[in-house]
Amino acid sequence: MVEYYDVLGVQRNSSPDDIKKAYRRLALKWHPDKNPDNKEEAERRFKEVAEAYEVLSDSKKRDIYDKYGKEGLAGGGGGGGSHYDVPFQFGFTFRSPDDVFREFFGGRDPFSFDLFAEDPFDDFFGRRGHRGNRSRPGGGSFLSTFGGFPAFGPSFSPFDSGFSSSFGSFGGHGGFTSFSSSSFGGSGMGNVRSVSTSTKIVNGRRVTTKRIVENGQERVEVEEDGQLKSLTINGKEQLLRLDNK
């Protein structure tokens, strides 16, 4: 039988933060899209890691698991307990590991920033992400889990700040594409600012398009490797100064 603490490589007295860090590391390591040559094992490990995180990240489920084992979560009351000792008498159904992954990362593609950073969450705490259906056309585009999200709409994240959304996908030979959007409401009516950003990495170059709409004015900036290449305000292209970076 799978032992959830062993799956995540943590101790029984590990803190919730330790559980989150362990899941983050192992989910990124065993994501099936990252292991095309070892997909069968990756899918099994990815599922086990998601199950372990679902249980150990929830204090009530973790307490039941510690007392009764996995049978307790199914309402069976293992480990010497009785069925009626278990609060979850109707059983607990595990979600899809993809859903757990999407929710944990708030809909944002964890591979769009430094995958090997000590704590990639440092890059997007407080961000808000959309959840969507996983789509893997043509045998599976890399991390297309994050494709198909609307620019704005209902969203959910464990680290919800209530103003932004983001997602991304890898598209075959076209390079990685990521999108993010933010909307800020001011104190008065009409004082609204929205920002949407699209980033493409094509042939080793990062091309970022930022669209800012504020008080009826639209500003579109296009940067290549951090250097501003074009600026358009309300559909009219602006002359750039040579010292623009």
Swiss-Prot record:
Pfam entry (one): DnaJ
Q: Mind listing the UniProt keywords for this protein, alphabetically?
A: Chaperone, Cytoplasm, Nucleus
Name one molecular function that GO assigns to this entry.
Answer: Hsp70 protein binding
Record-linked InterPro entries: DnaJ_domain, DnaJ_domain_CS, DNJB2/6-like, J_dom_sf
Q: Where in the cell is it found?
A: Cytoplasm, Perinuclear region; Nucleus
Gene3D superfamilies documented for this protein: DnaJ domain
Q: What is its main location?
A: cytoplasm
One of the GO BP terms on file: chaperone-mediated protein folding
| Parts of the chain that traverse the membrane | none
- Disulphide-bridged cysteine pairs: none
Cellular component, GO annotation: nucleus; perinuclear region of cytoplasm
Task: Cite the J domain residue spans from the record.
Answer: 3-69
What's this chain's function? Answer: Has a stimulatory effect on the ATPase activity of HSP70 in a dose-dependent and time-dependent manner and hence acts as a co-chaperone of HSP70. Plays an indispensable role in the organization of KRT8/KRT18 filaments. Acts as an endogenous molecular chaperone for neuronal proteins including huntingtin. Suppresses aggregation and toxicity of polyglutamine-containing, aggregation-prone proteins. Also reduces cellular toxicity and caspase-3 activity.
Query: Quaternary structure per UniProt?
Result: Homooligomer.
Name it.
Answer: DnaJ homolog subfamily B member 6-B
The organism encoding this protein is: Xenopus laevis (African clawed frog)
